[in-house]
């Protein structure tokens, strides 16, 4: 499984700001979108381009355009919504598929409760977005679902990943690619990433 920890200074700086204990909902939400946007830039760096002739201001001109890439952005509810707009800034025509999965706080197991997937998922690259890859359970369940629907190309974009979650994802789906802003120390006894970001969903939606 390909894992890319993006070490760009802007990514590291913005992620560091997100770790502050007393960060406001507004600021956390803004930064989640910004870091998500920067990670998308990296995750799409292998897109193929082709030469196309267009009408320029002074006549025909040959330009590069992305070669027929169909994409669906897949935010995992609810926290993934906080990163979605940052991805769509770069690909405003991308379709959006939504998967609702929450983690049972006692068993730490993923519990699916909603899905709305584009009909031609088998023709599209899926960019799954979620702030945290902790145990990996929710991500694995989401990828299971997408593959059951016929999806063949999947990339994962997360702000912070735990080594335990990456190992679990590797064991379940070694054909995906993961792009993250940080691989953190690990999980505590409650399954939270340390140092992590806290509860990203609560911070994005102001429900903490």
Swiss-Prot record:
Catalytic reaction list: UMP + diphosphate = 5-phospho-alpha-D-ribose 1-diphosphate + uracil
Binding positions for 5-phospho-alpha-D-ribose 1-diphosphate per the UniProt entry: 78, 103, 130-138, 199
Ligand binding (uracil): 193, 198-200
Cofactor binding, per record: Binds 1 Mg(2+) ion per subunit. The magnesium is bound as Mg-PRPP.
Family matches, as Gene3D superfamilies: 3.40.50.2020
One Gene Ontology biological process: UMP salvage
InterPro entries: PRibTrfase_dom (IPR000836), PRTase-like (IPR029057), Upp_B (IPR034332), UPRTase/APRTase (IPR050054), Ura_phspho_trans (IPR005765)
Group of enzyme by EC: transferase
EC numbers on record: 2.4.2.9
Cofactor: Mg(2+)
Keyword field: Allosteric enzyme, Glycosyltransferase, GTP-binding, Magnesium, Nucleotide-binding, Transferase
Metabolic or biological pathway: Pyrimidine metabolism; UMP biosynthesis via salvage pathway; UMP from uracil: step 1/1
Activity control, per UniProt: Allosterically activated by GTP.
One Gene Ontology term of the molecular function aspect: uracil phosphoribosyltransferase activity
Function text: Catalyzes the conversion of uracil and 5-phospho-alpha-D-ribose 1-diphosphate (PRPP) to UMP and diphosphate.
Protein family membership: Belongs to the UPRTase family.
Protein name: Uracil phosphoribosyltransferase
Taxonomic path: Bacteria, Pseudomonadati, Pseudomonadota, Gammaproteobacteria, Aeromonadales
